Amino acid sequence: MAEDADMRNELSDMQQRADQLADESLESTRRMLQLVEESKDAGIRTLVMLDEQGEQLERIEEGMDQINKDMKDAEKNLNDLGKFCGLCSCPCNKMKSGGSKAWGNNQDGVVASQPARVVDEREQMAISGGFIRRVTDDARENEMDENLEQVGGIIGNLRHMALDMGNEIDTQNRQIDRIMEKADSNKTRIDEANQRATKMLGSG
């Protein structure tokens, strides 16, 4: 009888320990899910900010291109004015290129496209039969499995977000380099045009 009582007590202790471990494991998966969801939200906000920054850079580069177009018109007008004033032989008539290489192709050489979503290893585990080895086989383990499945899916999406961010940052860095070249080119041409106009007015 004493041995039976001891065995029952041992089984009861084991059951309590199993319940405790199940509760702790469940809370752990809940925390994991919360953390990856927060990371996902942060990733989405970052992608949105990068997209908005990309739009701003597009507007800035379009402004540089418009200044370049306007400067071509201004340079033509100065040439016509120089001919009219008989200043064709004046050295200041010869406008420099102003960094013509800056006005090449605006393309970054990267095709903007969304990468195809693939099933990663964690998702494959969920598809093939779950993430955990069942002990209590109750609702807690069902929730653990569901939580881990969601965690695996979100981690896969975070990986794709990171790739998208890296590609967008590379694209924007190249665009910033182009904008800097165009800004330098425009400044040089504006300075030259101002000097030329000043000499013309001084000769007039």
Swiss-Prot record:
Cited PROSITE patterns: T_SNARE
Compositional bias of kind Basic and acidic residues: 1-11
Biological processes per GO annotation: synaptic vesicle fusion to presynaptic active zone membrane; synaptic vesicle priming
- Segments forming a coiled coil: none
Q: Which domain of life is it from?
A: Eukaryota
| Annotated SMART domains | t_SNARE (SM00397)
* Residues of the t-SNARE coiled-coil homology domain: 19-81, 138-200
One GO term of the cellular component aspect? presynapse
Cellular localization per UniProt: Synapse, Synaptosome; Cell membrane
What Gene Ontology molecular-function terms does this entry list? SNAP receptor activity; syntaxin-1 binding; voltage-gated potassium channel activity
Disulfide pairings: none
The keyword Iron appears for this protein: no
Q: Name the UniProt key words of this record, in alphabetical order.
A: Cell membrane, Coiled coil, Membrane, Repeat, Synapse, Synaptosome
Which segments carry the region annotation Disordered? Answer: 1-25
UniProt keyword Repeat present: yes
* Purpose of the protein: May play an important role in the synaptic function of specific neuronal systems. Associates with proteins involved in vesicle docking and membrane fusion.
Q: Which family does it belong to?
A: Belongs to the SNAP-25 family.
Q: What is this protein called?
A: Synaptosomal-associated protein 25-A
From what organism does this protein derive? Carassius auratus
Gene name?
Answer: snap25a
